[in-house]
Amino acid sequence: MAQYQTWEEFSRAAEKLYLADPMKARVVLKYRHSDGSLCIKVTDDLVCLVYRTDQAQDVKKIEKFHSQLMRLMVAKESRSVAMETD
């Protein structure tokens, strides 16, 4: 399990992991109210990337990362559906 200290390193590695095999990759968000920490984990069952934070400003970064991944998912699906219908 690779735990990253900086958001930039984590987001690059997580996007690369997703693009390597989109069908196996999954993202998990976990919030612990008791200590106010947020943990995001991206895994494909072989590699596990983790980023933990307790900073409120990182929530915006995580939200932006999620929307970026969703765009990648939708773009990939729309291309494959278009190829199937042709």
From Swiss-Prot:
Disulfide bonds: none
Assigned GO CC terms: cytosol; signal recognition particle, endoplasmic reticulum targeting
Any Gene Ontology biological process: negative regulation of translational elongation
Location(s) in or outside the cell: Cytoplasm
GO molecular function annotation: 7S RNA binding
Keywords: Cytoplasm, Ribonucleoprotein, RNA-binding, Signal recognition particle
Keyword Amino-acid biosynthesis included in the entry's annotation: no
SUPFAM superfamilies assigned: Signal recognition particle alu RNA binding heterodimer, SRP9/14
Transmembrane segments: none
Subunit comment: Heterodimer with SRP14; binds RNA as heterodimer. Component of a signal recognition particle complex that consists of a 7SL RNA molecule of 300 nucleotides and six protein subunits: SRP72, SRP68, SRP54, SRP19, SRP14 and SRP9.
The protein's role, per its UniProt record: Component of the signal recognition particle (SRP) complex, a ribonucleoprotein complex that mediates the cotranslational targeting of secretory and membrane proteins to the endoplasmic reticulum (ER). SRP9 together with SRP14 and the Alu portion of the SRP RNA, constitutes the elongation arrest domain of SRP. The complex of SRP9 and SRP14 is required for SRP RNA binding.
Similarity comment text for this entry: Belongs to the SRP9 family.
Entry protein name: Signal recognition particle 9 kDa protein
UniProt organism field: Canis lupus familiaris
